[in-house]
Amino acid sequence: MTLRGRERGVAYLFLSPWALGFLAFTAGPMVVSLVLSFTDYQVLDPGSTTWVGTGNYRRALDDPVLAHSLRVTLLYAALAVPADLVLGLVLALVLNARARGMALFRTAVFLPVMIAGAAGGSVAVALLWLWIFQPRFGLLNHLLSLVGLPPQLWVYSTRLVVPSLALMSLWGVGRSMLIYLAALQRLPTDVLWAAQLDGAGPWRRFARVTLPLISPALFFNLVLDLIYALQTFTQAYVVTDGGPGDSSLFYMLYLYRNAFTYFDMGYASALAWLLFALTLALTVLVFRSARSWVFYEGSPAGR
């Protein structure tokens, strides 16, 4: 065997654990779920499974509960995504200052992301927010009472539950802040100085220089936030369980109920692939729009 052949064999050997894991836990289940989406597979009675073709997908088009869950999810995304993008950018601008102890503040802002990412962390965070939203002795209503405002029902209100869960999503704002911060620290100082010498004020420098130069970071955060928002599950499952009155029945929660409450795995698989198609379509639209507002260094604006 030649030296190149041995090197290739060693490379495949090191690659094989990942490849086997990918086939067993990602590609394999995806193929199985795609096949199941064309059947009426029932978990409790797998022997009665029959091929229904596109029946599950046609059923989804006429499902009013699915339409409701999609509206709830899109409303949540419309609130949570802009809030994370704006607050993350504001925090990054503040924490980009050259001041003593700033590294400690940056760590403090990012720490909630690490907690939520730990094993069971997202459930623990959801339980913490359940206390924060508690109408009688929760933190939010206590803060409102300090400024003379009436208490709110928060997640126990059909009107406020989705905005409350969007507020809860800001627990992870440290992730977008960190990406913005990395982009801000790579800004060419000569361009900023040139804008200042030309008489541009702070707002004009931010809008005309800083924001275009960090637009790739904004684009990256937008794509991630959109995908995460469409797949929101833990908050609604732990905090509200879809209530009150299905007002927080997110798409993923409805999918979960079909799979593990009603045991209708065929229909649940179809819902999963429809969500994949929706996420892919929205992501493609964002990528298309990026041509007109994302600036890459060394290229014309929007390319």
Q: Where do the protein language model's features map onto the residues?
A:
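A structural signal for multi-pass alpha-helical bundles of membrane permease subunits
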Residues: 7-303
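Short, Lys/Arg-rich, polar N-terminal cytosolic tail immediately upstream
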Residues: 1-6
